[in-house]
């Protein structure tokens, strides 16, 4: 008589067998949680049970209306009537050998047909409470439902062959317990090969289970199997809503929740709703300043238990796994194995698409999604999908408002640890990214990448409308507004709209009178940084804009454009009163005051009025006696810059004003005008 096991023992034995577990995590949980009991009728039935539910599944007599199993003393009073018209075991096996799933329930046929008649060993029949759809992985169902004839199994004890492994197992259990299983290990003998396999798969403290891919250790076989699925990328659980497949049932459940439109958890403070209770709890902690989770080591408090656990790892001093190359220590052997590949340069995981190699299999899996476009991690709040779970977690903080990373210096919180690291360099002044061409250092790698484009001339951001290329994506976005005509930034004071936020900020200085940009040479202030840059060229003498016709240089591009109109004779600005044209709009504005008689600029000293501010400035020098413009050749000083320029032509010999009639040249425009009168008299 083979030894009988409770359902708990059977489950633990199944879980310990090496290789993929045929039970899903949900089924395993129900087995572990079930109390182990033996019904009083086990002597009659021959099978110990965990519950009445299992008793119904195992004992066929229990299922029949004429089976009295519920007497006061709970004894089994088995009826002896047996249906005489039952098919024989051979006929039933022949009818259902092709597909085990088609075998009817025991109670549907006869209350006296035993488990052994169906080729299922006593004590190994799956309880009814566990035979739910979804309790087995597709791989396990494939083993149970394999086609007849794929593999015939021999029984060593009899001249019998079986097409289904459960029938073979039943046959092998018929020999007596004096006949131990030929496999022996550690001095223990087993009647069933599955018992021996289960015994071999039980990990001990001396021999934990190790993942061959990453070196990570596990104390339980189900954990190892789950880890191996991560490396293989096997996806066995399919979502009925969208058809996506997942490697873990827990991830599938999360997927189901993302399809649910209901948001059951609503914040009473701000009204924001959440589908998941964990997201809701995290969000609520931000309304309260309470920090109930305190570190016993340093006393630091946190609003969330998960943040405390992460922090506590920083106090863990034990790192038993040390690198022989650099001495760096790790808490896990798997981390040491991955670290050692830095020294060896080993990259065993190669992408079959592009040949790129990686040190970690997880990095290869993430990289492969760049080729497939797969984004399996979806946000339950907004539906946005991501290729990596870490990116999803970072994104979800946008909805929850969680900022778990806090600066120790100023207390500023951040949602991402990378942002905290970048911010911390503000306090330390660290600039670890140095340009190999000019030596300039930067605090962020992205700033270095953008800077290097100055040396390479690279302009990777191209406008799809006009084809113009730019070094920075931000400049491209600003440029594209030219094509759309969009002006989203509007002044709240006067309603004027701008295409760029920077232009709006500069404009608002007109209303506030704010001039934040000061010249460190003379102290003059400006409302725009661009105006300050132009002004500073007065002190430096820089004139980067050169006329291609005469070689004259200018400090501003607008001044060059105006100058070029002297050569081409273009005068686009015409007075609507008298028709006189000008090459500058400012000259037209000044001229129009001749018609209006307007003189808005008044001297505070003598009260004289002027139509132009420049004329007033020049006039005021009469009262002050100031002569700020000095000739570098002879030292002579002048009150006006234009007079200095005319004077310098004495030293240079330049005569830019030519007479169109006779070709004579003059150093001053006024002298040319006087000369032209000679020709007009003629």
From Swiss-Prot:
One annotated GO biological process: positive regulation of megakaryocyte differentiation
Gene3D superfamilies noted in UniProt: Classic Zinc Finger
Keyword set includes Cytoplasm: no
Any one GO molecular function term: RNA polymerase II cis-regulatory region sequence-specific DNA binding
Region annotation Required for nuclear localization: where it falls in the sequence: 268-393, 341-373, 473-503
Tissue: Ubiquitous.
ZnF segments: C2H2-type: 209-231, 237-259, 265-287, 293-315, 321-343, 349-371, 377-399, 405-427, 433-455, 461-483, 489-511, 517-539, 545-567, 573-595, 601-623, 629-651, 657-679
Residue ranges with Basic and acidic residues bias: 1-10
Alphabetical list of InterPro entries matching this protein: Zinc_finger, Znf_C2H2_sf, Znf_C2H2_type
Keyword set, alphabetical order: Acetylation, Activator, Cell cycle, Cell division, DNA-binding, Isopeptide bond, Metal-binding, Mitogen, Nucleus, Repeat, Transcription, Transcription regulation, Ubl conjugation, Zinc, Zinc-finger
Major subcellular site: nucleus
Induction or repression: Up-regulated by hemin during erythroid differentiation. Up-regulated by phorbol myristate acetate (PMA) during megakaryocytic differentiation. Up-regulated by the transcriptional activator MEF2A.
Annotated positions of the N6-acetyllysine modification: 487
GO cellular component, one term: nucleoplasm
Region annotated Disordered, chain positions: 1-43
PROSITE patterns: ZINC_FINGER_C2H2_1, ZINC_FINGER_C2H2_2
Residue span of region Necessary for transcription activation: 62-210
Annotated crosslink Glycyl lysine isopeptide (Lys-Gly) (interchain with G-Cter in SUMO2) location: 253
Intracellular or extracellular location(s): Nucleus
Quaternary organization: Interacts with INCA1; the interaction inhibits INCA1 activity and induces the cell cycle process.
Family recorded in the similarity comment: Belongs to the krueppel C2H2-type zinc-finger protein family.
Role summary: Acts as a transcriptional activator. Promotes cell proliferation by facilitating the cell cycle phase transition from the S to G2/M phase. Involved in both the hemin- and phorbol myristate acetate (PMA)-induced erythroid and megakaryocytic differentiation, respectively. Also plays a role as an inhibitor of cell apoptosis.
PANTHER family xref list: PR DOMAIN ZINC FINGER PROTEIN (PTHR16515), ZINC FINGER PROTEIN 154-LIKE (PTHR16515:SF57)
Name used for this protein in its record: Zinc finger protein 16
Organism: Homo sapiens
